[in-house]
C-alpha cells in the first residue's frame, strides 16, 4: 500500500505526496533502518545520491552512490539536474532529479536518504514531501556509534558531533521524528510512515 501524506497546500494523492525524505545526523543509523525496510519491501525505490567523495571499502558505484568527479558534479549543478545539493567537508553531495521525477510521475513512492539541509531544500521546493528526522537517544550514544565505525579520526568525529548539534536544532521543522534507540522499533516506525494511507478529506474540509 503506497503512502500518502498531506502538506499545507498540497492535495491528497498529489504525486509529490509520495516522496518521503529520511534524514538525521551522521552515524544515527539511517542506512541500517532503510536497509531493513527495503528487505521487507524489495520493490521500494530509494534514490541513489551522487557525491564527489571517494568510495569507502565495499561501496559500489550506482548502488551506494553515484561517484562523480567535481567537474561532473558541477556540470549537473549548472544544468539543474539535481533536486538538492550541498558541499560538506570538501565534497559535493546531491540528489539526481530525473530518476526521482520519473518514478513519481508514474505514481511510485520514492524515498530519499539525504542530509538535513538537503531535506529542507526538498521541502521548500516540494511542500508535499514528508520529512522524517532520525535522532539518536543522546549525543553520547551518537558519539559512541561514530567511534565504533572506525572510519573517522577523532577530529572528524568532533566535527560530525558539532554538526549533529546544529541538525538536532532543526528537527522540529520535520514532519515526524523517530528515535533510533531500539532498531526494530525505529524500523517499524519508519515503515508505518511509509505505508500509512491517509484518506481524502471531505469536500469543503
Swiss-Prot record:
Molecular function terms, GO-annotated: ATP binding; guanylate kinase activity
UniProt enzyme class: transferase
Reactions mediated catalytically: GMP + ATP = GDP + ADP
UniProtKB keywords: ATP-binding, Cytoplasm, Kinase, Nucleotide-binding, Transferase
Annotated signal sequence range: none
EC number(s) recorded for this UniProt protein: 2.7.4.8
Cellular-component GO terms for this entry: cytosol
Coiled-coil parts of chain: none
Ligand binding (ATP): 24-31
Domain Guanylate kinase-like intervals: 17-195
Key word GTP-binding present: no
Record's subcellular location: Cytoplasm
Pfam families in alphabetical order: Guanylate_kin
Family stated for the protein in its record: Belongs to the guanylate kinase family.
Role summary: Essential for recycling GMP and indirectly, cGMP.
HAMAP family: Guanylate_kinase
Protein name: Guanylate kinase
Organism: Gloeobacter violaceus (strain ATCC 29082 / PCC 7421)
Gene giving rise to this polypeptide: gmk
Amino acid at each position: 500500500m503506497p503512502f500518502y501524506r498531506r502538506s499545507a497546500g498540497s492535495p491528497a494523492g498529489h504525486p509529490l505526496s509520495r516522496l518521503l525524505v529520511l534524514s538525521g545526523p551522521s552515524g544515527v543509523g539511517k542506512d541500517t533502518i532503510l536497509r531493513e525496510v527495503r528487505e521487507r519491501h524489495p520493490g521500494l525505490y530509494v534514490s541513489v545520491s551522487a557525491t564527489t567523495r571517494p568510495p569507502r571499502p565495499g561501496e559500489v558505484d550506482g548502488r551506494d552512490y553515484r561517484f562523480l568527479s567535481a567537474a561532473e558534479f558541477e556540470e549537473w549543478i549548472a544544468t539543474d539536474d539535481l533536486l538538492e545539493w550541498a558541499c560538506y567537508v570538501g565534497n559535493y553531495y546531491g540528489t539526481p532529479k530525473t530518476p526521482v521525477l520519473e518514478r513519481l510521475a508514474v505514481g511510485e513512492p520514492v524515498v530519499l536518504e539525504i542530509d538535513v539541509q538537503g531535506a529542507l531544500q526538498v521541502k521548500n521546493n516540494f511542500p508535499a514531501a514528508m520529512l522524517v528526522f532520525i535522532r539518536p537517544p543522546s549525543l553520547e550514544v551518537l558519539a559512541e556509534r561514530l567511534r565504533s565505525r572506525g572510519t573517522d579520526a577523532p577530529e572528524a568525529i568532533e566535527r560530525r558531533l558539532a554538526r549533529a548539534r546544529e541538525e538536532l536544532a532543526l528537527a522540529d521543522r520535520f514532519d515526524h521524528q523517530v528515535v533510533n534507540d531500539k532498531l526494530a522499533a525505529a524500523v517499524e516506525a519508519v515503515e508505518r510512515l511509509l505505508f500509512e494511507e491517509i484518506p481524502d478529506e471531505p469536500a469543503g474540509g
